[in-house]
């Protein structure tokens, strides 16, 4: 296996892990970064599969919580509601992804779409944060979420199908806009990532498994492990951050990064293809 290809897969995994749970669009970063380092895997599953490595970091970080839920389903009211909320929040994006996923990948998976959505999303975060600073959140614990709250977060997640929007950004901001406290919305976004990314990975693997080679599997494993380790670091760091701070720094980062992408395009460093 070529060392340069291995290094690129490792770098892509690190980018995925560090950005998956931040409201800055991991998919957008993978598209742009992959373009910059000229990383083009031989199949369409690499990026979605290494995202599963980052999601595994959430499972590891909250392993006791997930264990309690698994043992409590069918017996414990709190566990039942937790699973129900995840299912409700999962459905909107899953349905829309099945209906329009092919068209979205064909027409919107390019640096221009990413740049536009990064900038728009940055301004949206600024607005949501300003709005929450003026009103006391109605819900301050994940276990207090109602099915209607989960549905609103699920509807917000639909926008994340467009690259550059950010799955975590859309669900966290959607939750905050609905009156959910910042850290609570962040934790539920973490939990929701598990069924969402497991389903997306399974779908893409089943769809493209015929095109897998041993070379592809090796690159995926490298990216997977890198995404898991960096994802674990990101989850811990973000939870500490939102306990004391807000998401405004990420909003400015999105705006600057989006503008930088356009500058890179104008200078010829990246292309829209």
From Swiss-Prot:
Any matching Pfam family: BacA
Membrane topology: Multi-pass membrane protein
One GO BP: cell wall organization
Catalytically driven reaction(s): di-trans,octa-cis-undecaprenyl diphosphate + H2O = di-trans,octa-cis-undecaprenyl phosphate + phosphate + H(+)
GO molecular function, one term: undecaprenyl-diphosphatase activity
The keyword Cell membrane belongs to this UniProt entry's keyword annotation: yes
Miscellaneous notes: Bacitracin is thought to be involved in the inhibition of peptidoglycan synthesis by sequestering undecaprenyl diphosphate, thereby reducing the pool of lipid carrier available.
Name of the featured protein: Undecaprenyl-diphosphatase
Upper taxonomic lineage: Bacteria, Pseudomonadati, Pseudomonadota, Betaproteobacteria, Neisseriales
Gene: uppP
């Amino acid at each position: 296996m070529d060392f340069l290809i291995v290094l690129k897969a490792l770098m892509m995994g690190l980018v995925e892990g560090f950005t998956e749970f931040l409201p800055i669009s991991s998919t957008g970063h993978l598209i742009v970064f992959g373009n910059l380092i000229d990383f083009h895997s031989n199949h369409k599953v690499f990026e979605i599969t290494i995202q599963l490595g980052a999601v595994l970091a959430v499972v590891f970080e909250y392993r006791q919580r997930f264990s309690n839920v698994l043992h409590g389903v069918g017996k414990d009211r709190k566990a039942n509601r937790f699973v129900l909320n995840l299912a409700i929040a999962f459905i909107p994006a899953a349905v829309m992804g099945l209906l329009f996923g092919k068209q979205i990948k064909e027409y919107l998976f390019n640096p221009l779409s990413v740049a536009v959505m990064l900038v728009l999303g940055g301004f949206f975060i600024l607005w949501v944060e300003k709005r929450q600073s003026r009103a006391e959140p109605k819900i301050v614990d994940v276990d207090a979420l109602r099915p209607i709250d989960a549905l609103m977060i699920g509807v917000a997640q639909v926008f994340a199908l467009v690259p550059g929007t950010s799955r975590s950004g859309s669900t966290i901001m959607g939750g905050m806009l609905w009156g959910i406290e910042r850290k609570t919305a962040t934790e539920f976004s973490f939990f929701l990532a598990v069924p969402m990314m497991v389903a997306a990975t399974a779908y893409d693997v089943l769809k493209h498994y015929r095109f897998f080679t041993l070379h592809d599997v090796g690159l995926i494993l490298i990216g997977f492990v890198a995404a898991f380790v960096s994802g674990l670091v990101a989850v811990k760091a973000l939870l500490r951050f939102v306990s004391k701070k807000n998401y405004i720094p990420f909003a400015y980062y999105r705006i600057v990064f989006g503008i930088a992408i356009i500058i890179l395009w104008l200078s010829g460093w990246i292309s829209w293809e």
